[in-house]
Amino acid sequence: LSCGDVATQLAPCINYLRSAGPLPVACCNGVKNLKNSAATTQDRRTACKCLINASKSISGVNFGLAAGLPGKCGVNIPYKISPSTNCDQVN
């Protein structure tokens, strides 16, 4: 799993995360694909770091929406998408 994979899966979510539109089906599909491809602890930590870095680098991201995204898509991930998340603690 690479940050490129994470970015590709979550690209359809960007406008939603900027509070600029409805939650697209393609975004939730990307969230689900990402969860399914993060099979190991190392993959989950990588995905976490990529998500946090991406969310910090995209201007105008609403972190409340980012944190709620997995739940809105019906996906459980073992960490919060937040700038303060310590990805090294993700199992």
Curated annotation (Swiss-Prot):
CDD domains per UniProt: nsLTP1
InterPro entries named among the record's database cross-references: Bifun_inhib/LTP/seed_sf, Bifunc_inhib/LTP/seed_store, Plant_nsLTP
Gene Ontology MF terms: lipid binding
Subcellular location: Secreted
Pfam families: Tryp_alpha_amyl (PF00234)
UniProt entry keywords in alphabetical sequence: Disulfide bond, Lipid-binding, Secreted, Transport
Main location class: secreted
Single GO BP term: lipid transport
Disulfide linkage: C3-C50, C13-C27, C28-C73, C48-C87
Gene Ontology terms: cellular component: extracellular region
Similarity comment: family membership: Belongs to the plant LTP family.
Function, as annotated: Plant non-specific lipid-transfer proteins transfer phospholipids as well as galactolipids across membranes. May play a role in wax or cutin deposition in the cell walls of expanding epidermal cells and certain secretory tissues.
The name this protein goes by in its record: Non-specific lipid-transfer protein P5
UniProt source species: Vitis sp. (Grape)
